[in-house]
């Protein structure tokens, strides 16, 4: 599954995680992406959307 929102473009962010002893390890933070059926140009289509776009109403779900 894609790790990028098709509505807002939110994607994976990389960075460094620090342990308690301050040792570093590289890691990735992935957005909460859901695969939903949404109406795109009047046609129901399966799209990958982040949960923030779903909650804010930027996506019209197909029933």
Curated annotation (Swiss-Prot):
GO molecular function: structural constituent of ribosome
GO annotations of cellular component type: ribonucleoprotein complex; ribosome
Presence of keyword Ribonucleoprotein: yes
Signal peptide: none
GO biological process: translation
Classification via InterPro entries: Bacterial_rp_bL28 (IPR050096), Ribosomal_bL28 (IPR026569), Ribosomal_bL28/bL31-like_sf (IPR034704), Ribosomal_bL28_bact-type (IPR001383), Ribosomal_bL28_sf (IPR037147)
Keywords assigned: Ribonucleoprotein, Ribosomal protein
PANTHER family: 50S RIBOSOMAL PROTEIN L28, LARGE RIBOSOMAL SUBUNIT PROTEIN BL28A
NCBIfam families: L28 (TIGR00009)
Family per similarity comment: Belongs to the bacterial ribosomal protein bL28 family.
Protein known as: Large ribosomal subunit protein bL28
Provenance organism: Clostridium novyi (strain NT)
